[in-house]
Amino acid sequence: MTPAEAVRLATRNDADRCRELCQEAIEEVGVRRGGPMFLRRETGLVAKALLRPGGLDRLLADSRRRVLLGTYDGEIVALAVGRAEVVGESSLGVIDACYVEPVAREVGVGKAVLDALVGWFTVIGCRAVDATALPGDRETKSFFESNGFKARMITFHRSLKDTER
């Protein structure tokens, strides 16, 4: 991490900026293959929380969750949300959201927030971390792979309606 980039915990004063970043992420993901279902099923609770008044407060109050912000030259340009999930006898870290504004990609902010989230998962005793990339989203897939992640599952989906992507 260079002096230009930093990672910090979100606070309730960041609610408006978190809402903006969440909305940007939703718009970007929503047009990708599998995006609409992903938004409804996998990220629905986090997105709804960040988009509603008081929602960030609820996420911040949950000790099994972490909301991080990445800054570049003092401006908030990234959001990462993770949670610890009990799986059998151990905990699994789950990255619910990791979004960096397009103008701030490739400068290290995404890696910085990811490293901070993985560091938190390690400290609280998680044995592994899961993150999601949509089919065809090579940028996200490459980002996670370059940071030590490996695919462990592919989810297949068959729409029963012609209108669903």
Name each model-derived stretch.
Residues 90, 108, 139:
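Residues that form or flank phosphate/diphosphate-binding pockets in enzymes
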Residues 121-133:
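Conserved GNAT acetyl-CoA-binding A-motif
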Residues 4-7:
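Extreme N-terminal starter segment of soluble prokaryotic enzymes
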Residues 111, 123, 135-153:
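Conserved active-site alpha-helix within GNAT-family acetyltransferase domains
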Residues 105, 131-140, 157-159:
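Conserved beta-strand-loop-alpha-helix junction that forms the acyl-donor binding cleft
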Residues 97-100, 106-119, 142, 146:
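Conserved acetyl-CoA-binding loop-helix of GNAT-fold acetyltransferases
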Residues 9-13, 20-90, 96, 101, ...:
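Acetyl-CoA-dependent GNAT
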